[in-house]
Amino acid sequence: MAKYVDGYVIPIEKTKVKAYKKLATLGRKIWMEHGALDYYECVGDALDTKWGLPFKKLCKLKANETVVFAFIVYKSKADRDRINAKAQTDPRMQPKPGKKFVMPFDMKRFSTGGFKAFIST
């Protein structure tokens, strides 16, 4: 059966990667508990490539930034929709009472999308 993948490309300040990792660790726990098949968060390492459009240019990274490439794997698009609805309303994903939550990256610069897998393991 074909799988479904949510993909993310997230420009982020290098000094905020640690805070993002904490958030992503919680996200992984929640998405996996609700039925995701796999969950990856990957931070840029070899971004100066000679082929194609390097992530540095694609994301217009500043000198103090890197990029996170992340993806979550689901059994199907229907499963993805069900799991996302549960995960996004999970109480652990909600801001603590009386505390304002600020994302560790610029929400206007990140990219996301859903993808039908046509080759997978």
Feature map (PLM): residue ranges:
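Glycine-rich beta-strand-turn "strand-cap" elements at beta-sheet edges
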Residues: 32, 38-63, 89-121
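Short amphipathic alpha-helices in soluble, non-transmembrane regions
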Residues: 21-27, 83-90
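Short, well-ordered beta-strand segments in beta-rich or mixed alpha/beta enzyme
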Residues: 5-12, 51-87, 113
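Residue-level signal for secondary-structure boundary sites
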Residues: 18, 78-80, 120
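N-terminal pre-domain and mature-chain start segments
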Residues: 3, 26, 30-34, 97
